[in-house]
């Protein structure tokens, strides 16, 4: 970044913002880059601001029992805030004084007041000086207040982030990631732009008092008629606002439902295509969209009338102020025009400035209170460890994740019992729990000596991870003692990769040791992977390591833990994503040899690992089932395998239910606090559905559980969670993106958090931060790929993983709205900022406007209709003004009249009443025409939005994966959330406002041109100057806004990344380093935002300067060229003031329209995406004249002989696959054939291309070559017909929000009897029957009430229903409990006995059932043989299979031993002094 010219700028340059000219010039000529942005001054750095506020907040905490954050903010920013407030007030006062001088100028033209004619020129100079002073006061004041707001936001951003890193895990379990993002985005952004309005809470009343005093001088008591009307108007607008909020609240649930389905579709787009569900998903989403649009139209109409009321209230304000006085005493034209000018200022103060200021204070204080509550939450406390001990001891330890479960329910019962009058659907109250206070660990005892290996085993949900968390201090024991050294290293179950290089991820801030580093790389089998990268271990890994395979991420995470020298290593299932051979080698070389002298606790379920362990601890439902050696285990616990694997009395479903349903229901209905909230608020927070969908949804909270752990639900009054919650005051459609995506360039949108299914949907779905930390990094990342496909790994679908801490058991899409890495290096930031924005120009093109107008034919006619009505309004205005300027004037001739009454007066005799009759008639006509002329426009623009949404949805569903792979899920979802919200809500009203303002300006210019042609001549160059200035500024401002939006994403990405790796961060003590990274991300955003604010103020000030010059010209032209007659001068000067203020507004509105039209550009870009599918060759009918057999794939009534595929024979010839057109080949020249009914196993190391091959079979990639099924080539039939030949069970199970029936049969092709029959076959009937409604039970949030095994069975049922002859299975047993795995094996043998099965699997026992094996190495087929031949040769399969398995297969063979591995000596321990910086 460059040094800012602001540092050396003069006072004049700072006052007029001239120091921004270099960046404006550069932005106009070329595209701006990050390197062009100026560095921020030190006073704006996050380090300084956060330190300042943190110091004051600590002081507040120390000095008071009830600390207030607002006091800390006041001590930091109050005096500067008030300083600029005074300047703002003085600027507003000049607006009130201007009409006085205008009145004097008009009065000087009265024929009876010729002595003042000589001073008219001086009055004109004074009026112009007032405009100059106002400009010089207002703009620096507004900029200063924006600057203070920015500093407050930065300081609180930092404070919140630092607090987040200190929060206890129990607190994190109760806070959703959506709440945190809302806290940082929704609430804090109120300070950025709202602070300038805050002063109007006291300025506006003073302004009104001053104006009413001045108007009283003119009109006496009748002045209050106009004020009364304005107050009534403000109340009317408030009523309309409440009505609009009611419609928006109703609409919120519909938008939520649509975005839930849309987000699930986007995250699982590969599965949608594999199942051929494109049409079903499109129909489902469009049905929800129809309901949503009905409410959208109602809200838009109300908002339209609200906006129109302000535009057309001016007639009545002036009319009601003037009419009573005129009827009683008569009135002079000077008073009319002066009153008009006063009323313009008064209307703005009463109906806009004061309500906005009150709302700003309300929102800001609410935000401060939420942040204050958050900052006072319980912090993580490191346990007091004995640093001299060498052993690890637990004595009678018991722990709860939920602190005081029993107390929580007792409190809930008490609160509900106190509300005996409540009934109905208000909330849910739980009773009859046998789960009260269930500990996650109970009475745990063990002791291991230094250098020993403890293997911790147990079924899913037994408490293995909780045990490690307790040792780390994340989970505090409620009873018992823990003793060990504080030098801990930790490897999480789900690998966490921070943005940075591979080397940085492994070293992780520990001092670099070349020998140690190389030894760890070798032991973790990373040498070969690193050698494939051009940059070796210096390759920059993006967000979450998305360019790496799951196995590569797991090995890097393990290497990080091993590299740190510690006394105790905690390894939580580190081998979950590794193939059998790699796992075996790493366990031997790394865990057993490299770390031989270290104390290790390994969570595992592998028998080979238990045999090698010094001690074994088996957990069952939180209790210690066994502790001892392996030999003791065999003697004392012969049934240990059932407890270990979960095949006996352990209920997999109930364990998951304990951790997901109970906690989720607690979160959903927030039974922690006391404050009652309305049902609508509860509905917003709980993501509850409405209508028929919602009625079913009520039942979905229940869970089929075994009889021991049932609970009942009673309807009671709701409770609300204390502390932070989602901003229920913010209408949903204004929250439609968690974080603006990197393309966003809106100049007018408040930067608030809005739904995007990443954290936005999470905000609605109450995804806890603890769940975020314990969830698979693979989730949702299949679409999150960069363009460089060479290092990309695709699986058939990303994996879904569950742990005992998976509190909500919901799919997680945190990446969808957070697209940019927080890496700080500027060059790396360019990499991370990649998005599809390059093809969207900085300024919206005319082609986009033309295309938008022609989307709906009616829009052109509506625009013509608006123009016709406008011409009628101009004609009516001319009539009124002609009457005012040319009314016959009479002199009452009474010498006793006051001086005011000696002026020319509009006499109120009967002969002159016609003036007011005509005025009222014209005003009513204009009001009626103005009110209704925009309705057809708003209605038609919403229809255009509906059409564009439909086209975009269709395009995304039909787009090839090669195109979707280059897009980020967040970018796609933002099109459907934020951009569609803009098209629905903001764009129609903004276009209406712009057209309205433009027509007002044109009409006023037309009137002035008739009255004074000289002024028209002066107007033309001014308008030209405005247009040129707008074009000049727009080029730079949109680019700066773009960069600012991009700079915002790393902030939120860094927050989510930090939360995902929080346990690792704390274990390694890297919080200060990540705070530094966060501050750098904040500083980067600040540099862009500050520059944008500065250039915006430069533009606004230049507009004001042009206006001042124009007004000076108009004033002197009218004074020098007008002869007698005050009417003409009054009209000209009043209209001149209105023309320029309205023209300024129109120019700003045009910038807003251009910004919003960028959303339209992005939507068009998605609509223009290519569609997938190659042109098919023509197929010839059979000899009997029937249609081609490939056309009757779905027809169950056709004779079996004609159904395709009939056998499942598959021939692959020279198959080559690529992720993108023209990219590197990821599979090359694959050729083999499969006989009907044969089972083929895919073998290969992690990342070799096994899952990619399955994707290629489904034509999800760019492919070359040919595949035939039963003699039919894939080129001869459509894509849909080809994919329907396959049944698919992907890695990541796709369960969308809907009923069981919809999930199994979305096209509604099968009867209930057939569905139940299949459910019986796959073992799902007993599960489905336990739910209310059975097949009609609504699954939500990725099927959170189902275990992972049940979800896999759902996929199996889909394949059985599809009658597919070829079944593709991609890691079906990954993270499955053995019960579900055995059901899948049995179903495969029975239901798919005659089908061709292609299996990609890591479990040896599953692979042994295959007849043929396809071995893939380096993207090519190395072997394709039977199991006998592979065992005879030195193959991967032979190395992977254990001798015992070989004996089981072929007892008559002697299993040969594997090649000995190179010895790796254990690392010597480092001294105490060398590891001080890594200690907790």
Curated annotation (Swiss-Prot):
Binding annotation for ATP 2: 1219, 1244-1251
GO biological process entries: amelogenesis; bicarbonate transport; cellular response to cAMP; cellular response to forskolin; chloride transmembrane transport; cholesterol biosynthetic process; cholesterol transport; establishment of localization in cell
Sequence ranges assigned to domain ABC transporter in this UniProt record: 423-646, 1210-1443
Reactions the enzyme catalyzes: ATP + H2O + closed Cl(-) channel = ADP + phosphate + open Cl(-) channel; chloride(in) = chloride(out); hydrogencarbonate(in) = hydrogencarbonate(out); ATP + H2O = ADP + phosphate + H(+)
Compositional bias segments (type: Acidic residues): 1470-1480
CDD domains on file: ABC_6TM_CFTR_D1, ABC_6TM_CFTR_D2, ABCC_CFTR1, ABCC_CFTR2
Top-rank lineage group of the source organism: Eukaryota
Protein name per Swiss-Prot or TrEMBL: Cystic fibrosis transmembrane conductance regulator
Annotated source species: Pan troglodytes (Chimpanzee)
């Amino acid at each position: 970044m460059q040094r800012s010219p602001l540092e050396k700028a003069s006072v004049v340059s700072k006052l007029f913002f001239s120091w921004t000219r270099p960046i404006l010039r550069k932005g106009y000529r070329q595209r701006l880059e990050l390197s062009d942005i100026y560095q921020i001054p030190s006073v704006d750095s996050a380090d300084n601001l956060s330190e300042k506020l943190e110091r004051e907040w600590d002081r507040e905490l120390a000095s008071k029992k009830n600390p207030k954050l607002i006091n800390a903010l006041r001590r930091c920013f109050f005096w500067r805030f008030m300083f600029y407030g005074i300047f703002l007030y003085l600027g507003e006062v000049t607006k009130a004084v201007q009409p006085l001088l205008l009145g004097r100028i008009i009065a000087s033209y009265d024929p009876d007041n010729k002595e003042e004619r000589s001073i008219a020129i001086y009055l004109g100079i004074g009026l112009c000086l007032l405009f100059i002073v106002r400009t010089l006061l207002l703009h620096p004041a507004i900029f200063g207040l924006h600057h203070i707001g920015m500093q407050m936001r930065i300081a609180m951003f930092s404070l919140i982030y630092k607090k987040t890193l200190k929060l206890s895990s129990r607190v994190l379990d109760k806070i959703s990631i959506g709440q945190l993002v809302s806290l940082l985005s929704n609430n804090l952004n109120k300070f950025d732009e709202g602070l300038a309005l805050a002063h109007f809470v006291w300025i506006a009343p003073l302004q009104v008092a001053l104006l009413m005093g001045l108007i009283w001088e003119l009109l006496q008591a009748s002045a209050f008629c106009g004020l009364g009307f304005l107050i009534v108007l403000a109340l009317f607008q408030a009523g309309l606002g409440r009505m609009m909020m009611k419609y928006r609240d109703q609409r919120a649930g519909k938008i939520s439902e649509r975005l839930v389905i849309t987000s699930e579709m986007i995250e699982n787009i590969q599965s949608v295509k594999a199942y051929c569900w494109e049409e079903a998903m499109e129909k489902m989403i469009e049905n929800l969209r129809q309901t949503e649009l009905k409410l959208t139209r109602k809200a838009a109409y109300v908002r339209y009338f609200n906006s129109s009321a302000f535009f057309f209230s001016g007639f009545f304000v002036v009319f009601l102020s003037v009419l009573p006085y005129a009827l009683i005493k008569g009135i002079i034209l000077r008073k009319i025009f002066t009153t008009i000018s006063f009323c313009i200022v008064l209307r703005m103060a009463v109906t806009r400035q004061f309500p906005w200021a009150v709302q700003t204070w309300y929102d800001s204080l609410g935000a401060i209170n939420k942040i204050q509550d958050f900052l006072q939450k319980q912090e993580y406390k490191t346990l007091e460890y004995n640093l001299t001990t060498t052993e690890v001891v637990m004595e009678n330890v018991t722990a709860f994740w939920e602190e005081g479960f029993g107390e929580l329910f007792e409190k809930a019962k008490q609160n509900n019992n106190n509300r005996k009058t409540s009934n109905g659907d208000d909330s849910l109250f739980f009773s009859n729990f046998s789960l009260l206070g269930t500990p996650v660990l109970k009475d745990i005892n063990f002791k291991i000596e230094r250098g020993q290996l403890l293997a911790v085993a147990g079924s899913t949900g037994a408490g293995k991870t909780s045990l490690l968390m307790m040792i780390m201090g994340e989970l505090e024991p409620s009873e018992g003692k823990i003793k060990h050294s504080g030098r801990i290293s930790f490897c999480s179950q789900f690998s966490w990769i921070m943005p940075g290089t591979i080397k940085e991820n492994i070293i992780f801030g520990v001092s670099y040791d070349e020998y140690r580093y190389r030894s760890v790389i070798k032991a973790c089998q990373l040498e070969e992977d690193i050698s494939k990268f051009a940059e070796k271990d210096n390759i920059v890994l993006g967000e979450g390591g998305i360019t790496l395979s799951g196995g590569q991420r797991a090995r890097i995470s393990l290497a990080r833990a091993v590299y740190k020298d510690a006394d105790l290593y905690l390894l939580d299932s580190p081998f979950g994503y590794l193939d059998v051979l790699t796992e075996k080698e790493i366990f031997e070389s790394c865990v057993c040899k490299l770390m031989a002298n270290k104390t290790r606790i390994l969570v595992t379920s592998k028998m080979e690992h238990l045999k090698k362990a010094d001690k074994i601890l088996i957990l069952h439902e939180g209790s210690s089932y066994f502790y001892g050696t392996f030999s003791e285990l065999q003697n004392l616990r012969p049934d240990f395998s059932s407890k270990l694997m979960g095949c006996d009395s352990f209920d997999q479903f109930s364990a998951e239910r304990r951790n997901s349903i109970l906690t989720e229901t607690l979160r959903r209905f927030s039974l922690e606090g006391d404050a009652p909230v309305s049902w609508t608020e509860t509905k917003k927070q709980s993501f509850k559905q409405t209508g028929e969908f919602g009625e079913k949804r009520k039942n979905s909270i229940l869970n089929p559980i075994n009889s021991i752990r049932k609970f009942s639900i009673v309807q009671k009054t709701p409770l609300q969670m204390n502390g932070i919650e989602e901003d229920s005051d913010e209408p949903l459609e204004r929250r439609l993106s968690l974080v603006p995506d990197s393309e966003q360039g809106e100049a007018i949108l408040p930067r608030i958090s809005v739904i995007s299914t990443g954290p936005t949907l999470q905000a609605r779905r109450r995804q806890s931060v603890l769940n975020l930390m314990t969830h698979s990094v693979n989730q949702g990342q299949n679409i999150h790929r960069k363009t460089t496909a060479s290092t990309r790994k695709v699986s058939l679908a990303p994996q879904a993983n569950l742990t005992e801490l998976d509190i909500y058991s919901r799919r997680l899409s945190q990446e969808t709205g957070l697209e940019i890495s927080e890496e700080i290096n500027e060059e790396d930031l360019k990499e991370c900022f990649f998005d599809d924005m390059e093809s969207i120009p900085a300024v919206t093109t005319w082609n986009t406007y033309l295309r938008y107008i022609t989307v709906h034919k009616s829009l052109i006619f509506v625009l013509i209709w608006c123009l016709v009505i406008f011409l009628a309004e101009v004609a009516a205005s001319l009539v009124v003004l002609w009457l005012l300027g040319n009314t016959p004037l009479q002199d009452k001739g009474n010498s006793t009249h006051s001086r005011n009454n000696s002026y020319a007066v509009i006499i109120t005799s009967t002969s002159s009443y016609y003036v007011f009759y005509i005025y009222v008639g014209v005003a009513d006509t204009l009001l009626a025409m103005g009110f209704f002329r925009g309705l057809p426009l708003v209605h038609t623009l919403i229809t255009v939005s509906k059409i564009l949404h439909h086209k975009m949805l269709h395009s995304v569903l039909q787009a090839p994966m090669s195109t979707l792979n280059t897009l980020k899920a967040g970018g796609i979802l933002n099109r459907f959330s934020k951009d569609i919200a803009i098209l629905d809500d903001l764009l129609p009203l903004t276009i209406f406002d712009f057209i309205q303002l433009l027509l007002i300006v044109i009409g006023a210019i037309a009137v002035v041109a008739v009255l004074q042609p000289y002024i028209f001549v002066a107007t033309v160059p001014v308008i030209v100057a405005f247009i040129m200035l707008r074009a000049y500024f727009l080029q730079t401002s949109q680019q700066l806004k773009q960069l600012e939006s991009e700079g915002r994403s790393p902030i939120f990405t860094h927050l989510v990344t930090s939360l995902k790796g929080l346990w690792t961060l704390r274990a390694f003590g890297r919080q200060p380093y990540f705070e530094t990274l966060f501050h750098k991300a904040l500083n980067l955003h600040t540099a862009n935002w500050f520059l944008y604010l500065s250039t915006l103020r430069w533009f606004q000030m230049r507009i004001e300067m042009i206006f001042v010059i124009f007004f000076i010209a108009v004033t002197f032209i009218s004074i020098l060229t007008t002869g007698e007659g005050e009417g003409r001068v009054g009209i000209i000067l009043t209209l001149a003031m209105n023309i320029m203020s309205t023209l300024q507004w129109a120019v700003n509105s045009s910038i807003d329209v251009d910004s919003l039209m960028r959303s339209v550009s992005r939507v068009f870009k998605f609509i223009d995406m290519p569609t997938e599918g190659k042109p098919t060759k023509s197929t010839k009918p059979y000899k009997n004249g029937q249609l081609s057999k490939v056309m009757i794939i779905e027809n169950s009534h056709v004779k079996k002989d004609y159904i395709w595929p009939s056998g499942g024979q598959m021939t692959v010839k020279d198959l080559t696959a690529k992720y993108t057109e023209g990219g590197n080949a990821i599979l090359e020249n694959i050729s083999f054939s499969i006989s009907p009914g044969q089972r083929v196993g895919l073998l290969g190391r992690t990342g070799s291309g096994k899952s990619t091959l399955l994707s290629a079979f489904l034509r999800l990639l760019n492919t070359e070559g040919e595949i035939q099924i039963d003699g039919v080539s894939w080129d001869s039939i459509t894509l849909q017909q080809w994919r329907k030949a396959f049944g698919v069970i992907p890695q990541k199970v796709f369960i969308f929000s809907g009923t069981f029936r919809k999930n199994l049969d979305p096209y509604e092709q099968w009867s209930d009897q057939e569905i139940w029959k299949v459910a019986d076959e796959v073992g799902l009937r007993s599960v489905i029957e336990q739910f209310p409604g059975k097949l009609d039970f609504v699954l939500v949030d990725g099927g959170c009430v189902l275990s992972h095994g049940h979800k896999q069975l759902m996929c199996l049922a889909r394949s059985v229903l599809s009658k597919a002859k070829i079944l593709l299975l991609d890691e079906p047993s990954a993270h499955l409990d053995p019960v579900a795995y055995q059901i899948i094996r049995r179903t495969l043998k029975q239901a798919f006995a005659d089908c061709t099965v292609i299996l990609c699997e890591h479990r040896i026992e599953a692979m042994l059932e295959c007849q043929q094996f396809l071995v893939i190495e380096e993207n090519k087929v190395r072997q394709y043989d039977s199991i006998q031949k592979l065992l005879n040769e030195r193959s991967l399969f032979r190395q992977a299979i254990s001798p015992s398995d070989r004996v089981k297969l072929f007892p008559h063979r002697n299993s040969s031993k594997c090649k000995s591995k190179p010895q790796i000596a254990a690392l010597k321990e480092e001294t105490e002094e060398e590891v001080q910086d890594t200690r907790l």
